Amino acid sequence: MSKMTVRTHEKRFPVAPDLYGLFFEDISRAGDGGLYPEMLRNRSFEDSLLPEGCVTKDGGRTFVSPTGWIDEFNNGEGMNQWVKDNRILPTPVPAWYSDRAEMELDHETVLNPHRRVSLKVHFSAGGSIRNIGFCGIPQETGKEYHFYMFARAGQEVPLTLTIEKNGQVYGSAEAKVRPGDWARYDAAFSAQGSADDAEFRISCAADVTVYFGFTSLMPAETFMGHGLRKDLAEKLRDINPAFMRFPGGCIVEGFSMETVWYFRNTVGPVWERPSHWLLWHYRASNGLGFHEYLQLCEDLGVTPLYVCNCGMTCQGRNPRYFNEEEQADMVGDILNALEYALGPADSEWGSLRAKMGHKAPFRLDYLEIGNENFGPEYEWRFNMIKKAVLERWPHLTIITNDRGRTCRLEADIADDHYYNMPEFFAEGITHYDSYDRQDADVFVGEFSVNQTYEGQLRAAVAEAMFMVGFERNQDKVRLASYAPLFQHIRYGSWFPNLIIYDNRRSFAIPTYYSWRLFGGNRGKNVVASEEEVPKIYYDIHGLPALSGDDGVRYRNPVWNGSPVLPSRGILAEAEVNGNEITVIRKTDPEMPAFPFKVYPLVTLGEDLECREGVFETDAWYEEGKDIALGILVSPKPLSYYDRTNPNPCDPWSMRFLEVSRWILSGGTSRVARDSFPPRDISEAKEVSLKANAFNHLKYTVSGHNVTLEVNGEIIDTVELPSYPAMGTAATDTDDTVILKIVNFSDQNEPVEINLDCDVETEYTVGLLTGKATDENSPDAPENVHDVLIQASGAGRFFAYDAPALSVSVLTLVKT
């Protein structure tokens, strides 16, 4: 039986008021065709335009950026998988098709200076063009839809507008294009039936040429009347968020100057906003822009957290660092964005906000400078932007991506990101317990299980274990958000995502419901609590390995009685000379510099399924050089992103390994885990090695322990990595005690609860539980969800039976 002791009279600190929030990034068609419910794909006809400086290859299937990063393109249709799975037929203008009409992009006759092309259509009599939307144009009986377009022609041209499928017309309207310059034409439709995959058609009875500069088809009913998809925004509201981070994410950085996110390109009339290619494999119209994000935050009652570009493209995609002029321009763009949000209505950018319908300033409390940026190039840019911003807006809370590598970065909050396996998050429950309280506060801005059990219940419970760690450390962990947030089910760039939808339906993965439980049951103060819980050991398996500093020599490696040879090098190559192996360090240009030592690694043999065994080798000890041996090394499963990345991905690269290493350094022996940063899992033990000679090293893995021997003497027995089977945290208010209990084991676990106050016998339990692989789908949207249970039997001392793989929130009423 586990045990939880709660001392409500010992208030540790107030809860962090903004702890649980949202992170929006336009990924997997989260914007156009998603939260921004534009129904016409490629509404400005620009999807097939290559970003400046990029060159197509593979017959147009991919392009290469100016710095060498590869993206899937397919003439603007995006990922190869989308084209295949969605059965996209070839067309010169993505999403648009013609029947008895000729289409071409016109680069000269454009609607305004921000539009790069128009669609020139020569209709034969009775010809038409049609748009297939985001795998169909959705229709729902009785619902209203609004259409508008900018068009021009040399003569009066009557056009028929229809929403149809296989000859069935769901709505129709007429538009008469007047001769002369560009003009806007509007129409309204009332759906005469329901469909998921209709098409929008523009037909012409005459033989004539028409130019189309911009088109749009949107539902009339939107969230609070502000233009966003209602069911998706309601799901955001119902998760009880306190803030929203936007607009990214990697799209803030882009992979070239053209693909960088600039505030100025996302405000004003939507037909005047330049589109731009996102590094998530498609072009965004920027209809969902800075104003719309701020308005959504206001409508949800959450505080905005704006992420600005710091002056570079994505460091994980062959970065380009802005020159002095470009950097100054970016600083100006950031200041203009802040003026748009916060400035008076008579300021330059505040006046545009007022013209957009919001005279009063928006609320904006947080500014994050950069996304996942680091190193010297980041540090000086961060300091430059921070100084400029705080001189004008001193109330802003400044968030950094990194704590500094060549110098300490002074910021209010530092943003940490984690993507990993379920066990990582269960073990991470204690990660912030030892966090330096003098360091910046913490924003866990992106985290999720994206390797094994993605989008399933076991992942949700593992993430909840991690969140228990946030609950316990709210004096330093101030903000947290899951990532990514949205995915159109037909356009996945990443998996998992919190909320998934097609054109008419939406559902949430199990994680959504654990967030709803945590975000809806906050309390007022974090109170003292202790727990006694069982542990679960990692299922460790793999190969022995040689490691240590560059040039360390080994000889005669033997695994389970048989000699073994080098099989692969990670940041290393093996130089073999007879029975000797020297570990030679290799540089990896894609490996960032870390403020800690990362040892090269040479694996031995091929049996990745081995879980126990004896490894022996001789190691030459040279003063000042570390010797290290890898214990059962194997790569983690690749995430969906890494499996589908057009840039080749080696599963044996260091970032996919979490190696346990026996390290002999400076006269001590210890075992450490490579978890970036490495952490010791054993106490350092003194050890004596013969200098300038070979020393015999041996480790034996048996059960949950590894025994270490040097020159025939056992020097230590170390317990292999484990994680707690359960995590608990407690908060209270004047009237209630709130207990969060997460059981990550596959067995029910009784919990003995000891309180220092009287409570009513009746209490409630918010519960999420099920089987490890349980998940939701469009046809079973709530196969996994939380329930509210009325329970009884509470008191100063009582027992709660935590179901296997469960998240429980107990609310007790004080008496």
Give the label of every model feature segment:
Residues 106-127, 573-601:
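Short carbohydrate-recognition loop motifs
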Residues 296, 386-401, 413, 417-522, ...:
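Catalytic-core region of carbohydrate-active enzymes that cleave or remodel glycosidic bonds
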Residues 724-759, 765-770, 808-811:
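Carbohydrate-binding surface patches
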Residues 557, 617, 691-719:
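Carbohydrate-binding surfaces in secreted/extracellular proteins
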Residues 173, 672-698:
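Short, aromatic/His-centered strand-loop micro-motif at the edge of beta-sheets
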Residues 22, 53-118, 252-290, 317-332, ...:
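Aromatic- and acidic-residue-enriched carbohydrate-binding clefts of CAZyme catalytic domains
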Residues 126-238:
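Extended acidic/polar, glycine-enriched regions
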Residues 547, 590-670:
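Secretory/extracellular carbohydrate-interaction modules
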